[in-house]
Swiss-Prot record:
This is Protein RecA. GO terms for molecular function: ATP binding; ATP hydrolysis activity; ATP-dependent DNA damage sensor activity; damaged DNA binding; single-stranded DNA binding. It comes from Synechococcus sp. (strain WH7803). SUPFAM superfamilies: P-loop containing nucleoside triphosphate hydrolases, RecA protein, C-terminal domain. It comes from the Bacteria. Belongs to the RecA family.
Length: 382
């Protein structure tokens, strides 16, 4: 006769819901005792998991990023030369200092201009600046600043200038294949966890290089290997698309920023703004672009009007009017923000109301459908 064997059931199957909750609380308490408070938590109960942001200085870019640079995350800003990378980060430093925060600038390129930084609103007297000799020294300084939890933002300018010690101590022309990529990979593994715990935002500026032998696709790539691409929560691709001129005099550039990666908001949005030589990002220019798109300010020909009154002929004159009328500027900004909170999306340099976009799409769809029906009837009659 066959012998009946009783299968032993796992203890988890016989545990009641109340006992499961008790066991979970016990193990959570044990983990916190072993590894410290905050080592494990429920996502809904963790206030520090709610991502706060730092303004970029450009309202259009803030909207494209979902509020600004996320705190406690790694950000990479890359682009060609003279596209506005350093200017963008100096504005972020100024915003942090304006809120009473502490900022640090790791100048690996040894190219920081204090006079220009001060003109953008940076408090250079209280700005922490380091000009390291090697890439290892620079990244170790970043790690110690982050672990102190006393610094709100650290900017590294740039990844391409983080030269490994072995390359500096070697002879000119010696091959050091992959040394910078290995350095960045090790550094990102080490500092990313500390960045999240301290709430410090670390912005890496990066340069572009061309891949050799690429026939199809984009030949551009960033320096320092692939580690930074993976660890960065936000990656911004900034380009100069236009040179601003008054007659023959050049006074600024028009910059276009594409959000190539975003882990805290929808990616692939695009923002445009003006960067004025010696003054930085034109905040009033950003406001005027958004006010026009949201309908707060209207334009007929070259004239801009607000509440039915003409306020300026041409974009530059209208921006000048906003500078001379701060109360009206504040009112327009409030109205623009109210429009944006009602529901809108970033389209290139400004915003487009979702409802209007939906109506436009529906109208086009209906028109296309009627054309198809008319075509079918015509063919049937023939």
């Amino acid at each position: 006769m066959p012998v009946e064997v009783k299968s032993s059931q796992s203890s988890g199957g016989d545990v009641r819901p109340g006992e499961r909750d008790q066991a979970l609380n016990l193990v959570l308490g044990q983990i916190e005792r072993n590894f410290g408070k905050g080592s494990i938590m429920r996502l809904g109960d963790a206030s520090r998991m709610r991502v706060e942001t730092i303004s970029t200085g450009a309202l259009t870019l803030d909207l494209a990023l979902g509020g600004g640079y996320p705190k406690g995350r790694v950000v990479e800003v890359y682009g060609p030369e003279s596209s506005g990378k350093t200017t963008l980060t100096l504005h972020a430093i100024a915003e942090v200092q304006r809120r009473g925060g502490v900022a640090a600038f790791v100048d690996a390129e040894h190219a920081l201009d204090p006079v220009y930084a001060a003109s953008l609103g940076v408090d250079i007297e209280n700005l922490l600046v380091s000009q390291p000799d090697t890439g290892e020294m620079a990244l170790e300084i970043v790690d110690q600043l982050v672990r102190s939890a006393a610094v709100d933002i650290v900017v590294v300018d740039s990844v391409a200038a983080l030269t490994p010690r072995a390359e500096i101590e070697g002879e000119m022309g010696d091959l050091a294949v992959g040394s910078q990529a290995r350095l960045m990979s090790q550094a990102m593994r080490k500092i990313t966890g500390n960045i999240g715990k301290s709430g410090c935002t670390v912005i890496f500026l990066n340069q572009l290089r061309l891949k050799i032998g690429v026939t199809y696709g984009n030949p551009e790539t960033t320096t320092g290997g692939n580690a930074l691409k993976f660890y960065a929560s936000v990656r911004l691709d900034i380009r100069r698309i236009q040179t601003l001129k008054r007659g023959t005099e050049e006074y600024g550039i028009r910059a276009k920023v594409k959000v190539a990666k975003n882990k805290v908001a929808p990616p692939f949005r695009i923002a445009e703004f003006d960067i004025l030589f010696g003054r930085g990002i034109s905040t009033l220019g950003c406001l005027l672009d958004l006010a026009e798109e949201t309908g707060v300010v209207t334009r007929k020909g070259a004239w801009y009007s607000y509440e039915g009154d003409n306020i300026g002929q041409g974009r530059d004159n209208t921006i000048g009017w906003l500078e001379q009328n701060p109360e009206a500027k504040d009112t327009i900004e409030t109205l623009v923000r109210q429009k944006l909170t009602e529901g809108s999306e970033v389209t290139s340099n400004s915003m487009r109301p979702l409802a209007a976009a939906a109506r436009s799409a529906a109208t086009k769809s209906a028109a296309k459908g009627s054309e198809v029906q008319a075509d079918v009837k015509t063919k049937g009659a023939a």
